[in-house]
Amino acid sequence: MVALLGELRREMNGAVVDSMREKGIEYALSYGVSIPTIRALARQYAPDDELARLLYQQQVRELQLAALSIASPESVTEEELPFWAKAVTTVEMAENVATVLIGRTAVAKVALRKWLADDNALLRYAAMLVGGRCNELDINDIAESLTKALSDVPVGLEVVTTHGAAVLIGACGARSEEQRLAARAFIDTLPEGSLRERIEDEAGWQLEQY
């Protein structure tokens, strides 16, 4: 861990840290290292699940993000999902937890179901991105949970939440003609308003034809 931390600190970018703070992206400690750089450095240590868990428990942005690339997706179990969920406190972490690790595991569908019903809106966003990577997902199986998740979106998270929903709905609709029609019908059930309009704008074109 010490060696990786040293490498990350050498890549520190104060301007990025300041920019993140201005955008309201807060971490206990951040060096402002770019995600591609973090991933490149982390790959030198992968796979190492013990190291990944140790890094993920540190209150340092770069170490938590590196942990996601060092962990082995094949080793993640349902029992470990709460562990990986606990650092999802920013949009950036939600996106990376979902796409770098959990969306590539055998328990992705379990994570989708559990996280979509969570009180943490960022974890619900992560769930949607995970769902976008799940194979053989039926929109009808998640319609109720997704509708509920979209009915309780905190101020400031409207754009990312509708993006997550569009990713999930579009992915479901791309799997078959039946799912395309079901996804199209699901959007039509949503209450009229800006959230529905954003989802329609982003996912609608994917559902025009299979």
Identify the meaning behind each predicted range:
Residues 1-210:
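Alpha-helical scaffold domains
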